[in-house]
Every structure is written in structure tokens, then in C-alpha cells.
Amino acid sequence: MPKIFTDEEREALRIKLMERGFELLKTQGYKRIRIEALALDCYIAKGTFYAFFESKSEFRHQIMLYERQRAKDALLTYTDEDGKLSAKGLYQYLRWLFDENPNVFAYLTPSEQQYFLNEWPSGYIEHEDTDHATMNMLCHMLRKPRTDARRECACNLMKMGAAALTVPNLFLHNAWDETLDLLTQQIVACLTEQEID
């Protein structure tokens, strides 16, 4: 990359490209994203885009990783001053996840999802150790975790919610919000003894 950007400017531009790319993915779908238009949107040349990302496919992977990190960072905003997560904080975070839906898969067509799964490194998408680590981290952050926490059930419920968000047209629209609310309450009940205030 030419030295026309400082390291800070380079990182800010990389983030801008990913955020704008995710917006386009949500509104237009993956196949309709045009690198030329995205670069123009961010006031750079198409060639400069490829100094950040080797290909459109790598760009999509980086968006996914960025959104996952953004979701992890958001979790910290729901903790108390001592870094602990109350039942209410966990509930609010999970609702943010479902409402914000930073899951790239939710915006891909079924054929794009399959293509993406086939080219992603083996074991990355479905990795049991990662699932266990995530649930252990959540329980460790909780103010009052259940001694008999049902981590695997909570993990599956979270994945069910994420999967449901990829096909919202299968569900009754009028009960969607209440359904997500019940799902979220059940996840919280699997992990903490505290009531949601």
C-alpha cells in the first residue's frame, strides 16, 4: 500500500470499507455488491480496495470477523461497573444481538451460504471448543451464574435464534418479537440464577 495513509488512516478506512460493505450486503445481497461502487463510496480507487483485501471473498470473511468482534465488544457495554453481567444485562445484550443481527449469514442466499461454508477453513463455523469457550466466558462474566448452568442448551438456543434470523419469512411476523423475547428469557434462565429485573 502506498504511504499516502498513516497507519491510523489505513485502519479507519479498512473499517469504513467493512461497515459500508456490510450495509450493502444487508440491503443488496452479496452478489450485487460491486467493488467499484464500494470504493467510490469510500473515496478510494478500486485498486486501493485490493490493497486492503485480496479478493471479494476475503472481504466477506473480514466483514464476518469484524462483526463478530463488534458483537464481543458490545457485550462489555452491558456489564456493571465491576465488569459483571447481570441477568438484565445478559438479556439486553442478547436482544441487541438478535435486533442488530451482526450475523453475515442472515443476509446471504442459501446458495451463497453453502458456497461460503465450503470455502471457509475447516472447523471454523462449527467448532465445539469455540462454543464451549464462549459459554464458559459468558458464565464467568455473570454476577450469579447457575451452578447447574445448561451451557450447551443456551448455546443451541442462541444458534437457533441466529439461524431463525436467516429465514425470517418462515415465521409469523405478528409474534416475532414475543418469540425472540421468550427465546432470550430461556437463554438467560439456562445460565443465571438471577431474575431479569
Language-model features, listed with the residues they occupy:
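Amphipathic C-terminal alpha-helical segment
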Residues: 100, 140, 148-151, 155-177, ...
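Short, basic, alpha-helical segments at the C-terminal edge of helix-turn-helix-like DNA-binding modules
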Residues: 64-72
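Basic, helix-initiating cap at the start of DNA-binding domains
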Residues: 1-28, 32, 37
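Amphipathic alpha-helical packing segments from all-alpha helical-bundle domains
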Residues: 116-156, 178-181
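Short amphipathic alpha-helical segment with a characteristic S/N-K-E followed by hydrophobic residues
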Residues: 55-60
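Short helix-capping/turn signature of helix-turn-helix
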Residues: 53, 110-119, 159, 163, ...
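Hydrophobic alpha-helical connector segments
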Residues: 62, 76-103
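Short hydrophobic/aromatic patch on the recognition helix
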Residues: 43-53
